[in-house]
Swiss-Prot record:
GO cellular component terms listed in the entry, alphabetical order: cytoplasm; glycine cleavage complex
Keywords linked to the UniProt accession: Lipoyl
NCBIfam families: gcvH (TIGR00527), PRK01202.1 (NF002270)
Cofactor note: Binds 1 lipoyl cofactor covalently.
Cross-referenced InterPro entries: 2-oxoA_DH_lipoyl-BS, Biotin_lipoyl, GCV_H, GCV_H/Fam206, GCV_H_sub, Single_hybrid_motif
The Lipoyl-binding domain, residue ranges: 24-106
Function: The glycine cleavage system catalyzes the degradation of glycine. The H protein shuttles the methylamine group of glycine from the P protein to the T protein.
Modified positions (N6-lipoyllysine) in chain numbering: 65
CDD domains, alphabetized: GCS_H (cd06848)
Name of the protein: Probable glycine cleavage system H protein
Length: 127
């Protein structure tokens, strides 16, 4: 099965994605991750203002099959949280790269994204 891997994103081996624009990064889980999880029934995210550390967990995604931690691709301060996921966790399944975004972060050090997987490297990992 082939999964969508947008070329404008960077990826973690743990199946999170990050879209960096200036000093802001939007974060979510990949199409592969949501498929592996199955139907998502609950999402726990941090509050705005929370400090994230790259590689550390920041939330939980619960599906009918599993409970999984979600990891920060970059360090920084949470500036927005997708509150729709509290009432509509299925957005992670329906649109993981769009309406299913999880949070935005004011990035402390953009060079951290240099260590993340390129789209091609992530494709190689999930094939």
């Amino acid at each position: 099965m082939s999964f969508d891997v947008p070329d404008d994103l960077r990826y973690l081996e743990s199946h999170e994605w990050v879209r960096v624009a200036g000093d802001t990064a939007e974060v979510g889980i990949t199409a592969f991750a949501q498929d592996e999880l199955g139907d998502v029934v609950f999402v726990e995210l941090p509050d705005e203002g929370t400090e994230l550390t790259a590689g550390e967990d920041f939330g939980v995604v619960e599906s009918i099959k599993a409970v999984s931690d979600v990891y920060a691709p970059v360090s920084g301060t949470v500036t927005a949280v997708n509150d729709r996921l509290r009432d509509e966790p299925e957005l992670l399944n329906e649109d993981p790269f769009g309406d299913g975004w999880m949070l935005t972060v004011e990035v402390d050090d953009k060079s951290e994204t240099d260590d993340l997987l390129s789209p091609d490297a992530y494709r190689d990992q999930i094939e």
